[in-house]
């Protein structure tokens, strides 16, 4: 994925490369990948990337209001396509990677990972789950997908009062890492 992402940024930034740097609005989920490839991009091109991380929905709003980003790396295609439809983008929206929704658990969690969320449902009933962190479904695509998955598993009503909402995936991850949420 890193090579694909590096190539995507390289070709996307060709129009702004004369400036010596490109300003990138990137979904928080891309922090580790972009932190790794940014120095490689600079070494290969002589140009730097100035990366801001956050939720895709907030970046959409900022760009709509005139924020000077050269590249928008969203966690989904919805927000970039809106910018294209509103004639606020200079290029078509293109997918650059495919993400996966996961249930993040601390190493010593009493919850058991499973693809059906059956243990999460059991944890709701037996009291093992008091706080569940998700990204804000209004502005973060992974938050939206988490809400959809919980609704599909008929767990949304049960987890809703236990939610700890992060502004983006990075913040939701920090809630779990710090112990503020069990999952």
Report each predicted region and the residues it spans:
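Sec-dependent N-terminal signal peptides
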Residues: 4-13
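Short amphipathic alpha-helical "recognition" segments used for binding
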Residues: 7, 104, 175-178
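Sec/Tat signal peptide C-region and signal peptidase I cleavage site
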Residues: 15-19
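N-terminal segment of the mature folded domain
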Residues: 20-133, 138-139
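Ligand-binding cleft/hinge of the Venus flytrap
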Residues: 38-44, 118-166, 173-180
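Glutamine-centric residue-chemistry signal
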Residues: 62, 171-174
């Amino acid at each position: 994925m890193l090579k694909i992402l590096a190539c995507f940024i390289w070709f996307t930034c060709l129009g702004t490369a004369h400036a010596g740097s490109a300003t990138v609005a990137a979904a928080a989920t891309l922090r580790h990948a972009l932190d790794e490839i940014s120095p490689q991009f600079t070494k290969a091109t002589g140009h730097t990337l100035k990366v801001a991380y956050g939720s895709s929905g907030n970046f959409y709003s900022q760009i709509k209001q005139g924020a000077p980003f050269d590249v928008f790396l969203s966690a989904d295609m919805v927000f970039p396509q809106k910018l294209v439809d509103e004639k606020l983008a200079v290029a078509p929206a293109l997918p650059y990677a495919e993400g996966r929704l996961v249930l993040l658990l601390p190493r010593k969690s009493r919850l058991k990972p499973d693809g059906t969320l059956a243990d999460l449902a059991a944890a709701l009933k037996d009291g093992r789950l008091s706080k569940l962190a998700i990204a804000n479904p209004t502005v973060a695509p992974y938050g939206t997908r988490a809400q959809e998955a919980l609704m599909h598993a008929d767990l949304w009503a049960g987890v809703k009062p236990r939610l700890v909402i992060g502004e983006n995936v990075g913040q939701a991850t920090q809630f779990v890492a710090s112990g503020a949420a069990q999952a």
